[in-house]
Amino acid sequence: MENTSLIIENGKSISSEGVRLSIISRELLKEGTTYVLPVSIVGVSDKNLSVIEGSRTIYIVINQVIITQAADLSNRGEYFKVDFRKESKYNTAALTNVTFEARVRFKKMTPTSGKWCFSVMGLEENFCLRTAGSNTEGWKLQLSGGSPAIDSRDVLPNDKWVHLACVYDGSQGKKFIYVNGELQGELPDTRGTVDLTYAYGQDANAAFYIGQSAADDRYMNGYVSEARVWAVARSAADLKNNVCWVDPLTDGLVAYWRFNEPAEDNAKVVTDLTGNGYNATFAGWGNLRFVEGVRCPDNTAE
């Protein structure tokens, strides 16, 4: 920090120079973490003057931009499978609270598309985050399973990064859907628990899908940067504050996939960063592909 002693000349209300703050190294900054630095006026040399307390401290927000890769699932038949039958500290067959999160970019929600559904993640006829709509009315986010389904208030964009989430809160007996951290719908759901090991029409050995649901053409047709499964009911504030990254060891985080690279020992596997062992296996045709230059947060003009 430079210029920490400033002079306000007689008859003026601001100094001719300002305090200069420079970040000389990012080595100790955690990826995806936002930092807030308070800068305060310690005192003034003229004892006849006082500092307005409400203006004594300003807060500088240091928001890092992550530039990474994302899995390219834009072609038909490209998706991931996850086997949640493996034992961990979480009872994945009977979770009383659940949150799914994904940061995705749909690529084929176009006027020529004949599809009604683009899948995000989950379990068909159980707890499945997907879209529902048409090329005339657009596609909304939908949480299906545990009838009735919830549709989002707003239509989803094509070819833009969006953060999508659904929540089951067993204590309230409700389910919720969010787009970019904004609540888009809620309904009662008194099922009691969510089973991550079962889905209708999906692989019994790996029932949880990312980028597909059921057994027909409901593929995502887009990019996926991150996806997470929690054993807690995340709030809107939680969702907004951790779009780009979260500590893999956070309590309640069942599985966390960053789709920026394959596992070292298997080019078709994306590792679960929590250490719980719920790796995502590419089930599509051909090789797993990636797109580069993915920014988060993405504030560029589209």
Regions found by a protein language model. Name each.
Residues M1-T68:
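Short boundary segments that mark the start of a structured unit
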Residues R26-E27, V44-D46, F106-T110, G170-Q172, ...:
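Acidic glycine-/aspartate-rich tracts in secreted/extracellular proteins
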Residues G54-N75, W245-E302:
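Extracytoplasmic low-complexity segments
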Residues N63-N75, R103-M109, R130-V194, G286-A301:
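Extracellular glycan-interaction surfaces
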Residues I67-K140, R234, D238:
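Extracellular glycan-recognition modules
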Residues F84-F100, R153-V162, D217-Y223, P248-T250:
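Extracellular/lumenal carbohydrate-interaction signature centered on repeated Trp-anchored short motifs
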Residues V98-K108, R218-N242, V254-E264:
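Extracellular, beta-strand-rich glycan-interacting domains
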Residues Y200-S225, A237-C244, E302:
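Extracellular glycan-interaction patches encoded by glycine-rich segments
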